[in-house]
Amino acid sequence: MAGAPRGRGGGGGGGGAGESGGAERAAGPGGRRGLRACDEEFACPELEALFRGYTLRLEQAATLKALAVLSLLAGALALAELLGAPGPAPGLAKGSHPVHCVLFLALLVVTNVRSLQVPQLQQVGQLALLFSLTFALLCCPFALGGPAGAHAGAAAVPATADQGVWQLLLVTFVSYALLPVRSLLAIGFGLVVAASHLLVTATLVPAKRPRLWRTLGANALLFLGVNVYGIFVRILAERAQRKAFLQARNCIEDRLRLEDENEKQERLLMSLLPRNVAMEMKEDFLKPPERIFHKIYIQRHDNVSILFADIVGFTGLASQCTAQELVKLLNELFGKFDELATENHCRRIKILGDCYYCVSGLTQPKTDHAHCCVEMGLDMIDTITSVAEATEVDLNMRVGLHTGRVLCGVLGLRKWQYDVWSNDVTLANVMEAAGLPGKVHITKTTLACLNGDYEVEPGHGHERNSFLKTHNIETFFIVPSHRRKIFPGLILSDIKPAKRMKFKTVCYLLVQLMHCRKMFKAEIPFSNVMTCEDDDKRRALRTASEKLRNRSSFSTNVVQTTPGTRVNRYIGRLLEARQMELEMADLNFFTLKYKQAERERKYHQLQDEYFTSAVVLALILAALFGLVYLLIIPQSVAVLLLLVFCICFLVACVLYLHITRVQCFPGCLTIQIRTVLCIFIVVLIYSVAQGCVVGCLPWSWSSSPNGSLVVLSSGGRDPVLPVPPCESAPHALLCGLVGTLPLAIFLRVSSLPKMILLAVLTTSYILVLELSGYTKAMGAGAISGRSFEPIMAILLFSCTLALHARQVDVKLRLDYLWAAQAEEERDDMEKVKLDNKRILFNLLPAHVAQHFLMSNPRNMDLYYQSYSQVGVMFASIPNFNDFYIELDGNNMGVECLRLLNEIIADFDELMDKDFYKDLEKIKTIGSTYMAAVGLAPTAGTKAKKCISSHLSTLADFAIEMFDVLDEINYQSYNDFVLRVGINVGPVVAGVIGARRPQYDIWGNTVNVASRMDSTGVQGRIQVTEEVHRLLRRGSYRFVCRGKVSVKGKGEMLTYFLEGRTDGNGSQTRSLNSERKMYPFGRAGLQTRLAAGHPPVPPAAGLPVGAGPGALQGSGLAPGPPGQHLPPGASGKEA
């Protein structure tokens, strides 16, 4: 990012913020981007303009203070001139002070306009500097009041070398410290003023030539001291402010980046769950309420239509696919179905293998929900027909519809998936299974909702399905009047004979699908949730404008542009809405302390990077005082000793600060130590300057009875002496004024102790003048320019330093407040990001969620992964159907699902143990729990080595599930039984579905694992021969069941996993020390794996695929849950 300020070598060749030129990173925690504040302005003009806008109101306040001081200065001199006080020859300044006073007041009025912008303020500063220059030049000792020398009775006396020096020193310091002009301009002003006074003094002021060079040298040293201090104060104050601005900008940039990430996470979350459910679950997930039972997130909808659809012929097609081809093919097909669902106002619920089911009227109640589902079914059939005609692959769609009541929501604690339950859902599933390819199969209930808008024919579903026959359900087929939709690019007649392709493999099919993108515009999963859509942008900008009215909030959404430009635009809007009054409300008006004690404490803990430099500069000033003292002021042993002590002490302070910086900085240099050191250093330097003053004042003078001053002599005569005996008294007084300047360089010392110290120093200065008799000696008791000027000078200097101290304190505190608020909001956003990530990791596997969060949506590809060895488990509760019933007394089945939620939640809580960290819950299908192990990304050799360990973990988890279910049975007086099937082998994992992305695994391994469950025995764990081979060398006990007929696989040899055995051969549930050992013995209840098993029926006699809870996938994964079915219903038939 070209935001680094220009260095002395001219580093101005940077582009806009966010580009590569001049980019620098701050060495802060987390590698935040920083822009190094080196010199006066940033290389990036946009960033410099932002900084000027950021400092506008503070600079405006400083300009008002500067103009107030200049007006007071000119007004005081004009008042002294008006009263006709005798003084030095007025020269060209005669009559100019009132004019300058009016000019400064006029600029003060103009500056006080609230709508003043940066260019106008800069012009005001330049005009103020110009008027200050003319004021300073006219204060030089031109001596045009008459001939050189004294005039008897004249009002003017000869000009002196010290004439106008204090005015020029004050104006120079004001130009550096308070005026909003460029540093080079302020430096030029200081040099011109100093050079002009020295030149005029050298040429026009009469003086003894041998002493002139000493006077000019003393003046030059005083001008040098003020210029050095002014430059230091200006540069360090601006550096501190620029650093705070950059810190705030970096925090805002991080905050916006985190906001983008959070927006991705929120959109990802909203794509997986309905908003109302997601928000409620998120709140409870982050702040779990105290409750005995787990909260259930179920809603009831009484008037919806449910559609189940299955792709006929897809199993054989998919069996030939590679991992990439399979995921692409599924995403293409189901992505198109998601688009059709959106167009037809349906919400897709789940994808189970090649089965797709959705509901209309769920999230948004619709009176024509039946029409929407019928249109959806017909569109799906047309889509598959178009694919079949274009590719010459035998594919078709079987669709079943029913209208009724559903319970929708989420069960469990991990891997939430939105689902629906009810007897009507079961019936819709049966309608699909009993339908015919290419037909939309509907019930009489659905037909009644269509109001005769569609032609129908008898469906005779009872002839193909026993459930329909048992429950005497009449069914119908929708008869489309004509080919409803023509999808360009996929109709066979549109393909030229010369280019018609005969597909022999799936690869050719996929190539053709890619060529036919006019129909298939399926999005990459999650790609549509990674960027803001137009509506969201407009809504975000409206929200931003509202939030910008409140300064304390940085929350907004900004249109995505270049990162640096976006941050700069955002800060620009914040500055437009910035209100100093609101920010000052956080500070105490008098002490400027934060009203929040904790914030004040943190502010005082900030490191003062320039404290050592301030002490070095104080040492330089002490050395300058020493030179002035040696040049022009009469020496005394006491002052010399004080000067030596001051310099030695300051050198020791510099060494101490260097040591503390190396060893323990900033812990050793607390705010209390810095304040004490600052006060002592200022008092010490001022004491040196005041020692010069004391040595030059006429302490032997006393008042005569008539008010004149006399010197007491041994002769008794009382001659009146009109002048003090020390010719260097004016320069000593000037040293006293400049001696207060060290207060200005300790920037991070609070203004309150500075102002108290200024009051003490000013009082002591005035007391020395009065007690020494200096004022009476100079003016003989009357108001005189000579006698009044030192008091006027010290008052104006003290006023300027007090205003500057307060201004710097306000600047630093508001800068810190700005940066602290930005940092707090960034930290809050970081916390939100972590919270959202926790939720996302609860919806998707951690490595999958991280993949989508880290991916660039423009370069995102389909996520898929092929695994050679993965353990897959299906655990079902087959007798849950006997328990599920819909009655008014149980809220139409909600209370039954509440118990199922407890069971699934307890299963989920098992995965919180470190022992099961490698397990991944895939989903729940009704009362069936699906999990896998070995999906975490690992190297191939490592995966082969640890597959036995993974299977051992999966087997232990299955065993402990029996323990958990038995405990629930004991507490709820139920008799649920678990039936588990486990298989191991290659699988394909991926994310499909553009609108409702879903992570799943596919493959023959998954199908066989499902069959191990559906063909298993209640209370037993059935495993394949491969699982037995990998685990038999461990401490597991198996019983060979024999060969079992498995759909699509023929006869398979299977085993029952009986449990684990210890070294003595006795049977236990697990060797894991973390296992929770339930006290079943108190009720005489044993774990089912430890108790006697029910007799196993002969393998040949098992009704494969029949019975409650049977899961029979259609080639890729289990079909929709048989648990939806009421007693006696069968599962989904492919």
Swiss-Prot record:
Binds 2 magnesium ions per subunit. Is also active with manganese (in vitro). InterPro entries: A/G_cyclase, A/G_cyclase_CS, AC_N, Adcy, Nucleotide_cyclase. Residues 1-21 have a biased composition (Gly residues). Interacts with CALM. ATP binds at residues 310-315, 352-354, 398, 923, 1000-1002, 1007-1011, 1047. Gene3D superfamilies: Nucleotide cyclase. Keywords: ATP-binding, Biological rhythms, Calmodulin-binding, cAMP biosynthesis, Cell membrane, Cytoplasm, Glycoprotein, Lyase, Magnesium, Manganese, Membrane, Metal-binding, Nucleotide-binding, Phosphoprotein, Repeat, Transmembrane, Transmembrane helix. Pfam families: AC_N, Guanylate_cyc. Glycans are attached at N706. Mg(2+) 2 binds at D310, I311, D354. GO terms for biological process: adenylate cyclase-activating G protein-coupled receptor signaling pathway; axonogenesis; cAMP biosynthetic process; cellular response to calcium ion; cellular response to forskolin; intracellular signal transduction; long-term memory; neuroinflammatory response. GO terms for cellular component: cytoplasm; glutamatergic synapse; hippocampal mossy fiber to CA3 synapse; membrane raft; plasma membrane; postsynaptic density membrane; presynapse; Schaffer collateral - CA1 synapse. This is Adenylate cyclase type 1. Residues 495-522, 1027-1050 are annotated as: Interaction with calmodulin. The protein contains two modules with six transmembrane helices each; both are required for catalytic activity. Isolated N-terminal or C-terminal guanylate cyclase domains have no catalytic activity, but when they are brought together, enzyme activity is restored. The active site is at the interface of the two domains. Both contribute substrate-binding residues, but the catalytic metal ions are bound exclusively via the N-terminal guanylate cyclase domain. Catalyzes the formation of the signaling molecule cAMP in response to G-protein signaling. Mediates responses to increased cellular Ca(2+)/calmodulin levels. May be involved in regulatory processes in the central nervous system. May play a role in memory and learning. Plays a role in the regulation of the circadian rhythm of daytime contrast sensitivity probably by modulating the rhythmic synthesis of cyclic AMP in the retina.
